[in-house]
Amino acid sequence: MTKLQKALFIFLNSLIILFVLILLSISIPKFEIARVIANLYTPDGQFESFTLIYAKLRYWLIFIGLMLLLTGTLALIFHKRSTSFFLHTLSKIQDAFKQLWLDAAVFLKALKNQFDLKSGLMVLGITLIGFGIRIVLSGKPIQYDEAYTFLSFASRPLNKALSDYHLPNNHLLHTLFVHLSTRLLGEGVLAIRLPALLAGGLLIPAAYLLGSKLYNKFTGYLSAMLVAVTPILVDYSINARGYTLVALFTLLTWCLGIYVTRHANSFAWVLIGLVGACGFYTVPVFLYPFGILFTWLLLNLLFKQFSQSYSSQINFFMKMFVAGTLTVILTAIAYLPVILSSGTASLFGNVFVQSLSWSDFIQTVPHRLNDTWQEWTGNVSLIFIIPILVGLAISIILHRRISSLKIPFQLASVLFLIPVLLIQRPNPWAKVWLAFLPIILVWAAAGLVGLLDQMKLSRKSIKVITAGICLVLLIAGLRHTVTLHRQYAQPGTVEQIVLDLAGELQAGDVVISMDPVDIPLQYYWRVNQLDPAILNSDNELIDRAFVVVHLPFEQTLEGVLTDQGIAIDNPQFLQEAELVEDYGSSLLYVINAD
């Protein structure tokens, strides 16, 4: 052992002991003393939220501190053995990083080879079409959930935005991206929707990758075009929520999973862990696609369906275990601010994730499946639905003939989802399953291309027919885009109400509304820089009240006022309300206080 190595070892142990002493200095004294000490370690002398953190972590810090102190002390006492162990471990880590670097180069080269000039241009063209459709429609009026995401989370300082989980509406990684995009580009709807839009557009080349890896390039092209123009995928891409991110991470992890069964590449395994953590940090429902992936990997392990470049089944299992562990550790670290601020109950015990009773679960599932079907097939003609269903069925029936995999992902999906859903008994909202739609479209594309192949058509004929199908899909997608663009070209109802009120408001006015109008109204109020106090119905000095009544939710003037805590003692009061404007879906009334 060189002097430099010995000095490094002693230095690291000294740092451990110093860190331990700081922990113990905060944890062991009484609260007031601990708070004063903690303030010494902050730049401004004020440790925010120290009371909450101290109460939750004190005994854990004491335990961790004592264990580290014991470890560091023993390492210094038995320095020869511990130094030898340290150097051996350091050498292993260095070797692992060298191999990781080499594997990264191999992986990137393999990724580059997925796109020759011709296929690269094809995928780029389809991707640009998909992005174009999404950008054209990005002016859609802001919806309740995305307005709530921005106002309640993304517009706040990051330390608040990424620790507040009072509703699972906070898709944390998406919130982080929206926070950054709105800081850079302003608070317009396009800036708010940019992360979802980018993820939705990147689904297109990701679908090509999965289709080409599972089947062939023709399947990849058709998959990409289906993802580019499918209405519900376009709609989620212009909805500032985290679901397109989850879908993107799903496709990426599945592509990586296929790759690692064919190549013993440590870098790809690490990417599975990193991308997996990103998926969980976006929305915890990423458990479903990620669980299916690891079920499929486990099946490949059991039936030895992996590359001979792995030295053994144990070698494959250890890499799989490391990737899974990396995902768990990174996810736990990412959610630590939430746990410290809101506790684990906000993640696992909120009303939206609690298990249903068996009777409620059995009654709910058929309705949710119908909701999912209606959402996925809305604005889609039967002319397209039937071929997709036929293609999906063929991909399952002809799996062994058309797929490059011996173990189908469909089997892993059944083996994982059925027991998990029966144990968990969730309320399976349609949006939970969006990540699977691009995969289903890949399977459908594979079935259609596989059918052409089974008909013994030439490669040129398959190419022409596939191109023809893509052209038909493109025309249908563009027609649908033109129709929607005409609707979105004008301000939506809520935005128009705000614009109309902006020139009418005066001192003593108040604007009253309720769900689902109130949150979008607050957003447009904010971007138009109007006085937020006017939206406060608790204001005692009210001269005039504007009331928004949303007809699709069967709201009434009296119902809106009552919901906002305004008692109606005199029926004559409602009769004196004057209808200012009929917006079709909403009515705007004005009531004078006198």
PLM regions: where:
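An acidic-aromatic substrate-binding cleft motif
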Residues: 116
